[in-house]
């Protein structure tokens, strides 16, 4: 045995000072290694739609309903199963409804407690008792463990269980216990959650989603383009901040900004009302759902004015970054100087086009990108709100702690949008700073820049460059989070000809349906074999046009969650989520979610069907997972320590 091995084993012996303790730990770890792997849940492109997100989280993309079916089969009617599932999803709210309609609560409690324990037993069966114990609420841990490990078929045990239930009911703890056991089931059904990008966007509750994630037991995030926009704003990028505010106003979603993060929009509102007092702001009218009665005409007009004001500010701020970074090669996004302020047209490389709006009181034709003093004041005040928002900064910290550009996890490669490619399908070399990078090196360098924007000394050149780069990640042509020739925001506002709105996608989107390309990308990230996959979001799958969520002969899984209601008319569905358990991958297609109220009162669940079921080459055990490989290494080292004790190379220390 080599000296450095002995040095390490000496350290290990401090944790396991006797051969008996080593042997016990080996037995425990090998038992864990031979259990079925935990269930992973993959979601992407939530876009601030918190109600649908929370429901999918609670029902685990149909996993809880499947557990209920497995336990009760034909013993319960469909309506009874729906009622039980609703109770597990929303225990507090459902209990209130039951109390209003059921006078025989003691009988209901007895039946329900029995049903919940059976579902919990099913959810816990693949885990060690130790792991289950850690998921239990401390105040009920002992009693739930007793119930989980008792067999109700035995008459003596059945009486014992009934006596426990009676005690729970008679002491007035039934409601609290039902809530605790329901939330335990939710935790046990999903072992790990992957959010493959875009928590943020136009939906009303990104802050609620982040609050929910921060309380979740195990999760990770692969940053999306909208996440990067908010992260950029939160670290001090004014262009990112202006984009965030513009998008919120474009979709009349002010809840996240004002209620969620305490961003004061009043200075912007006053400025917009004064500056655009006689301007109809027609092209800046917010996009409202047909049934949206939230805003009256006066409010819609004010939002339109604010929308125009921040859009003009955004275009000016973006010019500053483009001017500071010629290496971005984004001069084609500076368009104000191409406007003919005399005849109301704009000259692009593709032709001359009439402008839909020519009222620009804050734009000086001789210096179109200069911010007025008032505009600069608005930027400073808004930026101050973003930087001082305690909740936003806490959420930013969470995004950094749990987030990354990509993740390799249990033979799957997760990233939100793209791996830039050349026309010949090779990995594209992209400039970041002074050097070029491709593939995995590119994503590693990009992540380094993102983290530098957060941790480097304030006002250092390193930090300022990294903060600017976060805006490039939002809309830069070679950004792995965007990967399109250009973002045509200006054209969409001011030019009617839709040909100018086109955003040419990078070659990744052209070639990602080819198996060889996906295998090349997987290999670049160290993954090879029949059970490897790319899990991708970002681009909605248009199911009603025949598009499929699986490509490259099974190597590519597209799970744009379709939570954004704006896309549901074009996709025909509410997107896809993915479940990966010990049997394999289950790609689940969802119908649109109505509301939390309907889910509780009418027991309306999201209609979901498994559209792809890919069985792994063998039932996956813990030892087949990334964590299992680490545990196997621990076992290997413990066996060496046991051998060292046996041969007297290391002396046992009695306690």
Swiss-Prot record:
Record-listed E.C. numbers: 3.1.3.11
| Keyword Transport in record | no
- Tell me the disulfide pairings in this chain: none
- GO annotations under biological process? gluconeogenesis
| Domain of life of the source | Bacteria
The record's section on InterPro entries has: FBPtase_class3, Metallo-depent_PP-like
Q: Which UniProt keywords apply?
A: Carbohydrate metabolism, Hydrolase, Manganese
- Which pathway? Carbohydrate biosynthesis; gluconeogenesis
Q: Listed GO molecular functions?
A: fructose 1,6-bisphosphate 1-phosphatase activity
Needed co-factor(s): Mn(2+)
Q: Which reaction does it catalyse?
A: beta-D-fructose 1,6-bisphosphate + H2O = beta-D-fructose 6-phosphate + phosphate
Instruction: Tell me its family.
Output: Belongs to the FBPase class 3 family.
Q: What is this protein called?
A: Fructose-1,6-bisphosphatase class 3
- The species this protein belongs to is Porphyromonas gingivalis (strain ATCC 33277 / DSM 20709 / CIP 103683 / JCM 12257 / NCTC 11834 / 2561)
The gene name on file is: fbp
